[in-house]
């Protein structure tokens, strides 16, 4: 009996500690330099090294403001899985497109939406599954074929697996409908984006900056491909900040007005 392969975790062990992309304040202490990171994914004493070409530098995230987006070269099908680490900066006023592609609203769909302040929607084949949760905030989204988990509870799904193929490549920060891009693009930050064909990791995309010109985007360490914005403006990227050991970086601070 074949065992299900271990997928690469969203929490990494580094040589001197741990890196969780949701709270990665210590990661800079474990980098060898701006383009080399030593990690392992199953908490053993064997470490892999993620090495970027010297022309790129690791970023904590890239941020979109409803204009930039990424056009991948991956066409989703019924066995596609995405594991994405995303912070949603605002509650969507109406149907903010997050990632995916489809033939039409109800045909050959593999897409994810931020519908409003309390609803995500995950579409698969011909099914649309609403997910009730506060949408502003930081989430691990695991859209695995016909089911969807969010940090990490099962919160949406369809009746079963379907054999289908989208006619167009998947996009990130928007949705590709048979070649037409949704105008209501994501306002938020992407920390990592992994694409699987069932259990095979096809793309492992991490935020980087091109040192020569400052352009930010996602770098796929599988195919060694850089994906900058395909939109009219570039992404904004945040570099890692090295803090003293007695401080941690917060997502935000809030005032009560008193």
Give residue spans per PLM region.
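Extended recognition patches within non-cytosolic domains
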Residues: 32-35, 50-54, 191-243
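Flexible glycan-contacting loops in extracellular carbohydrate-active proteins
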Residues: 157-189
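Extracellular glycan-recognition modules
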Residues: 53-121, 197-203, 241-258
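Extracellular structured ligand-interaction cores
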Residues: 79-83, 136-138, 145, 169, ...
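N-terminal low-complexity, intrinsically disordered "leader/linker" segments enriched in small/polar
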Residues: 2-51, 70, 74-76, 207, ...
